[in-house]
Each structure stands twice: as C-alpha cells, then as structure tokens.
Design a protein with these regions (language model features):
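Core segments of small alpha/beta cavity-forming domains
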Residues: 1-93
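Glutamate identity and glutamate-enriched acidic tracts
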Residues: 3, 25, 56, 69, ...
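Intrinsically disordered, low-complexity regions
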Residues: 25, 38, 48, 90, ...
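Surface-exposed, charged secondary-structure patches
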Residues: 83-131
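Short beta-strand edge/turn micro-motifs at domain boundaries
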Residues: 121, 139-168
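Short, cysteine-centered beta-strand-loop-beta hairpins and adjacent loop/turn segments enriched
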Residues: 127-141
Length: 168
C-alpha cells in the first residue's frame, strides 16, 4: 500500500463520512423535507452520490472504500437510528447539525504499518478545536488506527473506520 494510495483512500472514506453525518451542515441552501416528524435532505443532491437512491446502492458504493460487511453494518445502523431513510424511491439523510466546534479540526496520515498477510494499519492523527474556538487552534490530538486490507476485487478497503465514532 503506497502512501499516495493510502491518503486517497482515507480522503475518499472521510468525504463519504462527511456526506453521511454532516449533510445538514453542508446543505448548500437545499430545503429539508419532513418525514415522520424529522428533517431530511435527499442524498442524491450530494454531488458524487447523485445516482444512489437506495440503501443497497449505497452499500455497493461504499464497497469501494469499506469491506462489504462493514459497509452493510454502517448502513444498517444509520437506518436503525433514522439517519438514513428510503422514501418514495429516494434515499434521504438526516438534516443534522453538530456542536459548533466539532467541524473545526483536521487530520494527518502519520504512518502506514504492515500488519501481515497483505493487511495494513493506517495511523492517522486527528485533532479537534477547543470548545467554542473557530480559529483552528487545536486542543487535542489523538492517533487513531484504521485497518486496511484488499477486498475480493483486489482494492484496498477499510475493515473498520474508527473516525466514524471518534469524530462525531
């Protein structure tokens, strides 16, 4: 796994995470719809996800960046938590907002470790802004370990993505 490929894989996976968890923050003026008393935005309005209109299609798309079973687990959790809803042939994502300083932070790929048998671990340093600070002065840095291996198609994919939990 070359560094440039690892960076590209992490960037794509992180962008997908932003799409699924921070859609409300980046709505671009789109008006939410109310489904079952909760506000949602159509996932199809989110750029590169514009041809995805079902949870199954999203799982297939995620399979380029995440192991199939892990992608399925993430989407199942999103549907269960009502962050993701299929309605009238359209896939909607919750119009959620997050704490004011949670958007301010960054990351850096520090290291690629061999884990044996064609598996790797990306060591990524994540940092977050201090509470209420929007000037990019970071209060905490944390190393997070992301396991990577090849899928059946021979593509490197994440078998877990701890950023999903720690960055929320």
């Amino acid at each position: 796994l070359h560094e440039a490929d690892a960076r590209r894989l992490f960037d794509k996976a992180r962008s997908l995470w932003l799409s699924l968890y921070l859609q409300g923050e980046y709505a671009g003026g789109k008006k939410p719809v109310t489904i079952g008393g909760k506000s949602y935005l159509p996932l199809a309005d989110w750029g590169y996800l514009n041809n995805i209109n079902s949870a199954e299609a999203l799982i297939r798309y995620m399979g380029h960046y995440f192991a199939a079973e892990y992608a399925g687990q993430l989407i199942h959790e999103a549907v269960t938590d009502r962050r993701l809803v299929e309605y009238n042939g359209t896939l909607y994502i919750a119009d959620d907002k997050i704490a004011d300083n949670a958007l301010y932070g960054g990351y850096s790929l520090k290291e690629i470790r061999k884990a044996g048998e064609g598996k790797y671990v990306l060591v990524v340093e994540i940092w977050k802004a201090a509470a209420g600070d929007k000037k990019y002065t970071y209060s905490a840095k944390e190393e997070i370990f992301f396991p990577v291996e090849k899928n059946a198609a021979g593509e490197f994919v994440f078998t877990a993505f701890p950023y999903w939990d720690t960055a929320r």
